[in-house]
Amino acid sequence: GYDTFWAAEHHFQREGYECIPNLLLLFVHLAHLTKNLKFGCGFNVNPMWHPLRLAEDFAMADHLTKGRVVFGIGRGYHSREVETFGNPSTAIDNDANRELFEEQTEVLFKAFNERSFSHHGEHYNIPPEVPYRGYDLKEITLVPRPRTLPVECWQPVVSASQRAMDFMVKYGIKGIIGGGAASGGTTDRVM
């Protein structure tokens, strides 16, 4: 039988293909219709999410499916999708997209792995230093935290640049090679 069913997040595809805007929501539903099958996020596109919302939604899905959702992240190459959400796609501004993606991934892994955390970067100030119930908020906690720690994370390997490979190693992210990436020489550079 099958072990894992993988699907990709895509938006605004009026042509009628790749029309799954929320993998986590779909996988929670499918997990309740199956007994053992795992579901792979191939991939949640970071620049179309706030990293804390993605972390919360994955953690909830992890609990509701009893650990049957495999987390995956991507940078976003469809300009129609990513740019519509107000962020740079790899097709329009690759450098800005990578910078945003890397910071979002840092926030995700802090949220998953630290009991409480803060992050002050170029794009995110988490939490904002605001008064809260009589004190200044300095850190937050992801609630719920993922059921399964450490979170297994996958990412597409497209360019196989040294920077991309080093980034994946830093966070223990596993790579998937397929589609156009495999025909573009990535397979030879990685293997």
Region spans (language model):
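Active-site-adjacent structural elements that line small-molecule/cofactor binding pockets in enzymes
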Residues: Y2-M191
